[in-house]
Amino acid sequence: MQINSHLSVLIHDLAKKHGGRTALEYKDYGGTQWKHVSWNEFSNQVTRVSEALLALGVGVQEKIAVFSQNSIHYLFTDFGAWGVRACTIPLYATTSEETMQYIINEAKIRYIFCGEQEQYDKARHVQNLCSSLLKIIIYDRSVTIAEHDPSSIYFDDFLKMGFSITGSGEVEKRQQSATWEDLACILYTSGTTG
């Protein structure tokens, strides 16, 4: 099988080809043991993210932000977003609050995914300055969510939101309507790259 897939279905096509073979190896936040993820597991997690994004009402080509260091969750989020034809905007893990505010406002971001405590704290502060930002989704369960913060949830709770979409065919409809013109990712730079 030749793999020449649109990003919206790439991981699923690779899972059909490679199934139970290892796709990724990673360490959890603060972990010391390597963990393995098969192509089938990777595909399953990507589908769950896609379903949860649809449950939130993420539209075609809507921009979502990821503010985290590299992690397995980051990959699930990217491919899950592309699975519903959303566009991801990565924010470097040490991005300043001023830069975050500019990007969130300029791109009209409603949802931001955060890695660790520092990223969550910045996102929470910036949320008060950005009227479009509705929800903060946190990868690391050890992050302490601020008291009286109903707009932030942990990634595993976010995934549960998608259960209402499971089996509805909505993700597949988005994937079938994907085009090569879809934006996948927008990278903001400091302007010093030339």
What are the residue ranges of the model-derived segments?
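Conserved AMP-binding/adenylate-forming core of the ANL superfamily
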Residues: L24-F79, S96-Q101, Y154-F163, S177
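Structural core segment of the AMP-binding/adenylate-forming
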Residues: G83-M161
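AMP-binding/adenylate-forming domain of the ANL superfamily
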Residues: M1-E25, N44-Q45, K63
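Helix N-cap/beta->alpha junction signal
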Residues: S68-N70, E116, D182
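Hydrophobic/aromatic ligand-binding patch that stacks against planar heteroaromatic rings
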Residues: G80, V126, Y188
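Conserved adenylation A10 loop of the ANL superfamily
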Residues: G30-G31, I186-G194
